[in-house]
Swiss-Prot record:
Mode of membrane association: Peripheral membrane protein
Reported phenotype of the disruption mutant: Failure of pollen germination.
The gene coding this protein: GNL2
SUPFAM superfamilies: ARM repeat, Sec7 domain
Domain of life: Eukaryota
Annotated signal peptide: none
Name the record gives this protein: ARF guanine-nucleotide exchange factor GNL2
Swiss-Prot/TrEMBL GO biological process terms: pollen germination; protein transport; regulation of ARF protein signal transduction
Family annotation (PANTHER family): ARF GUANINE-NUCLEOTIDE EXCHANGE FACTOR GNL2, GUANYL-NUCLEOTIDE EXCHANGE FACTOR
Amino acid sequence: MDRIAVRAKRKELGISCMLNTEVGAVLAVIRRPLSESYLSPQETDHCDSSVQQSLKSLRALIFNPQQDWRTIDPSVYLSPFLEVIQSDEIPASATAVALSSILKILKIEIFDEKTPGAKDAMNSIVSGITSCRLEKTDLVSEDAVMMRILQVLTGIMKHPSSELLEDQAVCTIVNTCFQVVQQSTGRGDLLQRNGRYTMHELIQIIFSRLPDFEVRGDEGGEDSESDTDEIDMSGGYGIRCCIDIFHFLCSLLNVVEVVENLEGTNVHTADEDVQIFALVLINSAIELSGDAIGQHPKLLRMVQDDLFHHLIHYGASSSPLVLSMICSCILNIYHFLRKFMRLQLEAFFSFVLLRVTAFTGFLPLQEVALEGLINFCRQPAFIVEAYVNYDCDPMCRNIFEETGKVLCRHTFPTSGPLTSIQIQAFEGLVILIHNIADNMDREEDEGNEEDDNNSNVIKPSPVEIHEYIPFWIDKPKEDFETWVDHIRVRKAQKRKLAIAANHFNRDEKKGLEYLKYNYLVSDPLDPMALASFFRFTPGLDKTMIGDYLGDPDELHLSVLRSFTHTFEFTGMNLDTALRTFLESFRLPGESQKIERMIEAFSERFYDQQSSDIFASKDTVHILCYSLIMLNTDQHNPQVRRKMTEDEFIRNNRAINAGNDLPKEYLSELFQSIATNAFALSTHSGPVEMNPNRWIELMNRTKTTQPFSLCQFDRRIGRDMFATIAGPSIAAVSAFFEHSDDDEVLHECVDAMISIARVAQYGLEDILDELIASFCKFTTLLNPYTTPEETLFAFSHDMKPRMATLAVFTLANTFGDSIRGGWRNIVDCLLKLRKLQLLPQSVIEFEINEENGGSESDMNNVSSQDTKFNRRQGSSLMGRFSHFLALDNVEESVALGMSEFEQNLKVIKQCRIGQIFSKSSVLPDVAVLNLGRSLIYAAAGKGQKFSTAIEEEETVKFCWDLIITIALSNVHRFNMFWPSYHEYLLNVANFPLFSPIPFVEKGLPGLFRVCIKILASNLQDHLPEELIFRSLTIMWKIDKEIIETCYDTITEFVSKIIIDYSANLHTNIGWKSVLQLLSLCGRHPETKEQAVDALIGLMSFNASHLSQSSYAYCIDCAFSFVALRNSSVEKNLKILDLMADSVTMLVKWYKTASTDTANSYSPASNTSSSSSMEENNLRGVNFVHHLFLKLSEAFRKTTLARREEIRNRAVTSLEKSFTMGHEDLGFTPSGCIYCIDHVIFPTIDDLHEKLLDYSRRENAEREMRSMEGTLKIAMKVLMNVFLVYLEQIVESAEFRTFWLGVLRRMDTCMKADLGEYGDNKLQEVVPELLTTMIGTMKEKEILVQKEDDDLWEITYIQIQWIAPALKDELFPDEEI
């Protein structure tokens, strides 16, 4: 404790010594004469008796203080020094020393805010410093004193007790400092610089305390005046001094200087130096105050009104330096106070930044404005907030869209080298694009972390308006999701309103109908809706608005009243309000219309006036009419004698309820109209920010929703980018084209990828446009260059290779969002192949054709989020960095790399193969577009082939890619292949379509797809049907196809029949396979393979045949056995297999019969069971139909030239009838029908053939061969007849049938063989008749009956056929 006490005592002694030193210094300077004649002894005594005595008294107390210095009233040791400063008899040098003494006292902080008397002491210091008096001296000494004053002022504000200063004292300090700045003008740069620095420091100190000022609970109303009373006066300075100082700083923006122009007259212009100084101080105040300004209404209103008005007024016409400072100030306001500055910020962009950037006169100013725009774009939330608050509000300008288009417009290169402003604009555009892309990716990342099925998934459909929602009413942000939908609808309304304005300007009726059709106005019509349309929609014809509002119809009058209610005239003068009203339309020429419109205005203006100057609205009405007439009088060149002010006042006497209006008021109105005419333009156009419009804007702030602070939403991001997508792509493409700098090219590609990152969320047309734009830089699609020129450009210029890498990178990364762009990609791919820059290794795909990926595997892949996000960005751009690093030609040459190897390295980085091998993750629509492009390219659309070989190779290449896609997407074959099939049909109708290479190269691939589908054994049979449908149209396109491709077709068809017949389930599949097998079996080279395949099918895989496919199998088998040069052994095998196939018919018949029997059960007595019964009956009939088809095949085969085959066909026919006798359930009529249509024609055809040979010369061998076959056929007839006899005898048609049998016996018996001798059938027929009639007698079918003439007919026919048999067959019987 003793050591602490000693240390404190030493500190107190040090303070005493310091004070003693300062007193001595001041006294020494006072006593020192400046010159021998300067001071007389009397004057020295006078100084000693007043100021010196005070200093001496202080010295007497210094070393004997009664208490600690921190507890002593500071005025005790400050007042002597202040007396020196305030004395006008003290030399300037002594004043300077006294100021230094006070500064030292403040710096070592002898007292603090808790010291008794500290507040009075601080205020006395301020009072003493600001009332400092100097005797006349030289300028250098005065400057030295002023420098000391500035230091002391700063010391005062930095002292801990400064918070005890009164508001007036703080304002005095600032004012004193500014006076020093002003007085230093022209006296020296050093003093002025120090003065400005001090002022800046004071502002920083004062406004840094603003966030700590307490806000009273009753503060916050728009008209609250609590700003000036919220801090207790005993607590030191507060918001009141901040308001006064800020007001003072704003007023500095209006400081003018008088300059002489070229004409020799003096004009007043803004003092730029003072403006810059003021802007620096205002910037500091806003930066340090932050959002605390928003807690103090009066200060906030000053920023909203005074400051913003000044900044906008001077911004558009200032120098680059001033504009730069203004932009910085506005950016700070945006950062801290944008919630309160919605309309003000819009006005700044509209009247300053966008206007200056559009003006092409002064490039430095334009560059500063552009930099201001870019600085805003650098703010993380600016672009989305600008879009939400302005672009989505029908009453505001499209700030975001216009900003983006301004950057695009300035990015576009000209014919010369790139300028600084173009580079700057490009950087801004890239920032904007990256901002949108990063935010959309960031939201996706956050959404995936929270929930894989988050609610913000992008829907590709645009916003549609389905109901009437008042477009002029904004909705506060409560629920974010609902609010996002609301602003998207408002943006859609805004677009529709622009279209409606266009319609309205051309035809009023069509414009109003368009409004109703798009739910922009209600039905029945709401007058406010139409009034808001007239009031807030830009681009409307003002003449048409005036004509509509002036119409006397009741609806038009209602709209007029609503129209006037959209104006806020509170606080406006009459002339200002009338100007604002008349600027929104053009007054019609009819006086009655003008009358109605002025009446509506007068009523609205009168209702919103707080003053008592007008007795009634009639007064306003009369005065408005008078002002309009005055405007015409003063500004119409045809009026020679102008009305004077006195005449105007005299004309308006006694209009205020019989009394006169104040003469001063009328005089002000007259001067306003005389000097500034009403703006009565016809069309909407650019306007200036004048005081009238500013008042209107401030009135609108009372009813407008505050600036919405919102987070990024991917739906909003997609919509906002769509507004600038076209210009952005064009600008980036043009910049890429005109730039040769590697870094700039890299930035262009980076921007292109970011555009694609945004476009993948439902903006597919934009991505297609991007790809088409960059494909032209590859030089691969230039139709006017030769392959050699293209190859040279590709090999020696980095830009084409970089563009190629970019295009295929987009295809790999964003292929799921590409639509029409696939055509350009395919064209580039084909050109690379034509240039031999595409080695086979690049496009070798590993696709398992036999098994492929399962559907569950594909679902796992597709369930993953395939969207590109920023986590992929580093690797993607890393590829381009690697590309740029390897693109050094000299380095490549040093490494021994040829041009081909360099190009190959680029192509390998393109990963072209993955586009197709990984197409399973592409969405359906992307697969459709990619396939369409490839099919059309394979058909030759857009291609020019120099040789047939080139055409064949190109077609094969395209088909390889098509098949790769199909093989990779078998799991969703039903989705995309129907469209592919339509594309195949379409290309067949192309004018220059060449079917041979197209089908020849396509068929093998289609068979590969077919085999994979069959190998997959899918539950759904539609893929099988689809692929066979395409195969069918392919080989039917041209009759030469089979001749060209028979070997390939045979190979694949045989494989399908042998290995995958169990998986063939469709009718068209079996039909196609067996038809192709039949056609290919006609060729000697493939005949044996085709026949073996059929025999294998019928021998080992016949169980896989269905009733439908059985018919095609029989047709195919018949086609083989009917061939003349086919193997007899194999044909006989086929005939045996055909006969044995009756067992399959029996099986199907029994199944159908069983089902039919079950359908008759009592429980099935419903309509559904009846339908089932009908189906089963159709099944039975179909089996009988198949039996007939089989028999018909045998019948046709009986006419074959080779005897072995004919005879086997006849016996097979008998075998089939015999096997189906009992098990196929033929009815009597059915049996007769089969024999009548198969066996009878067989005998007839053989008999006719026999007679034909008998008439030919040297044809005895053939005739005898045919005769032998006919014998067998006759025996078959007898055997079949006897087998089916008991069934057919029950038929009513048996008599006719029996006559048919006898007729054929007679025909064969009497066949005349001519010169070749006897007919050996005469030996067979009697035997056959004997057997048949004998059997019929045994079964008592052929007996004499009174009511049956069968016996009689037979008896008579036998006498004609073989009379010798009559006695044998009918020994005891006679007619």
